[in-house]
Amino acid sequence: MTYKPISWININSKKQIEIHEWPYKKIVHAVAGISNPGNFFSSLRSLGFEVVEHIFPDHYNFSKNDFENLLDLPVIMTEKDAIKCEVLDDHFWYLKIEAQISEGMEQK
């Protein structure tokens, strides 16, 4: 199974934009509190982003203090992490993805 990037969703406003319509520079803070953050960071890099990695433990409970020093660039996180965050500034986004079943798995 692979994951296909679908769109960007603003965490504060819930505004959704197409994956190719990113409105900012392509250097971002990437925040991940998941078990394998490398895949998330690789996905962003494959979309042409320069990534400043911020790794948190899996199932981390974020607070606004965790983001105090992330004001200079847009912040992208996983949908799983975004759901756990309080209202954040408008420069916080998450990457919406869709699972793609590989051809071999479909036939099983």
Regions found by a protein language model. Name each.
Residues 1-76:
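C-terminal accessory "lid"/substrate-recognition subdomains
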Residues 83-91:
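Short loop/helix-cap segments at secondary-structure boundaries that form the rim of catalytic
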Residues 78-80:
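Short secondary-structure boundary segments
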Residues 82-83, 101:
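Short acidic, S/G/P-rich loop/turn micro-motifs used as interaction or catalytic elements
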Residues 4-8, 57-61, 91-108:
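Short, flexible loop segments at boundaries between secondary-structure elements
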Residues 43, 87, 105-106:
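Short conserved micro-motifs at the rims of enzyme active sites and ligand-binding pockets
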